[in-house]
C-alpha cells in the first residue's frame, strides 16, 4: 500500500505495520535495511516514516512498505489511520523489559480491531542483551493467538530476515518461497552469543510442547 507521494513499483508490494511499546527497537530494526533507509518517506499527516524494503525471492521481487510510528506510541495509542489497509504486521517487544511483553495483547487487540485476518509476527527483540527479563519459555502469547514468533536482535542483525520471509510466504500463499539474495544491511553494532541463543531456541521448542498456562501472571509480577 503505497502512499500518495510514493511511486508504485511493478512487483507485489504490501503495507506492513510495525507496532509495540516505545523503545522496543522498531525503528532500529527497519533501519538495518540500507535501501529502505535511503528511500524512506515521512508522511506528516499520520506522523509516520514509511520505509520501502525490497527482497528478492525465487518468485521475483517483493516490497514491504514498513510503517514506523516515529515514536508517537509513547503518547498513547495509535490512530486508526496507521492501521488502515495494513496487509501484514509485526508486533515487537523487548526481552529486557517485562512491561513491553505485558502490553503485547493490547497492541494485538488494537491491530486486529482494524486489520482482520492478516498475517502477524511477534518479535522479541534485544536477545543480544545478557540479562533478559522475559525468558524464552515465558513467551506464550503467540501460541494463544496462532502467531509466528521469532527472537531477534536488531543491532546484531540476528534473524533479521525471518519475519519478512514468514510474511512473504503467507502473503504469496507459497510455503516454499525463499529469498535468493542477501539483503544489504548495516554492519552489526553488537555481537550475539550464538550458543546462548541456541539454548533459548531449544527452550522455546521445549515450551511449545507444554500445555499453555491459563494466564501470563507469572511473567508480569
From Swiss-Prot:
GO term, biological process aspect, one: ribosomal subunit export from nucleus
Database matches in InterPro entries: P-loop_NTPase (IPR027417), Ran_GTPase (IPR002041), Small_GTP-bd (IPR005225), Small_GTPase (IPR001806)
SUPFAM superfamilies (UniProt xref): P-loop containing nucleoside triphosphate hydrolases
Region (Switch-I): 40-48
Compartmental location: Nucleus
Coiled coil regions in record: none
Region (Switch-II) residue spans: 71-87
CDD domains recorded: Ran
Function: GTP-binding protein involved in nucleocytoplasmic transport. Required for the import of protein into the nucleus and also for RNA export. Involved in chromatin condensation and control of cell cycle.
Disulfide cysteine pairs (residue numbers): none
Family: Belongs to the small GTPase superfamily. Ran family.
MF (Gene Ontology): GTP binding; GTPase activity
Record-annotated Small GTPase Ran-type domain positions: 10-174
Protein name: GTP-binding nuclear protein Ran-2
Self-association and partners: Found in a nuclear export complex with RanGTP, exportin and pre-miRNA.
Amino acid at each position: 500500500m503505497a502512499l500518495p507521494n510514493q511511486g508504485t513499483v511493478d512487483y507485489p508490494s504490501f503495507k506492513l505495520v510495525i507496532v509495540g511499546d516505545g523503545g522496543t527497537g522498531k525503528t532500529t530494526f527497519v533501519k538495518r535495511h540500507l535501501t529502505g533507509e535511503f528511500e524512506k518517506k515521512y508522511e506528516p499527516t499520520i506522523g509516520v516514516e514509511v520505509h520501502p524494503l525490497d527482497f528478492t525471492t525465487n518468485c521475483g521481487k517483493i516490497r514491504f512498505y514498513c510503517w514506523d510510528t516515529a515514536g508517537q506510541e509513547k503518547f498513547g495509542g495509535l490512530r486508526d489511520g496507521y492501521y488502515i489497509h495494513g496487509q501484514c504486521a509485526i508486533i515487537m517487544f523487548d526481552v529486557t523489559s517485562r512491561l513491553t511483553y505485558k502490553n503485547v495483547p493490547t497492541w494485538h487487540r488494537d491491530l486486529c480491531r482494524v486489520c482482520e485476518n492478516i498475517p502477524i509476527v511477534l518479535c522479541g527483540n534485544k536477545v543480544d542483551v545478557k540479562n533478559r527479563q522475559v525468558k524464552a519459555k515465558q513467551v506464550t502469547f503467540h501460541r494463544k493467538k496462532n502467531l509466528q514468533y521469532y527472537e531477534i536482535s536488531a543491532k546484531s542483525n540476528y534473524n533479521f530476515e525471518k519475519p519478512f520471509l514468514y510474511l512473504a510466504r503467507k502473503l504469496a500463499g507459497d510455503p516454499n518461497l525463499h529469498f535468493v539474495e542477501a539483503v544489504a544491511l548495516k554492519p552489526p553494532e553488537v555481537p550475539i552469543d550464538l550458543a546462548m541463543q541456541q539454548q533459548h531456541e531449544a527452550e522455546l521448542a521445549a515450551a511449545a510442547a507444554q500445555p499453555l498456562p491459563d494466564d501470563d501472571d507469572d511473567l508480569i509480577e
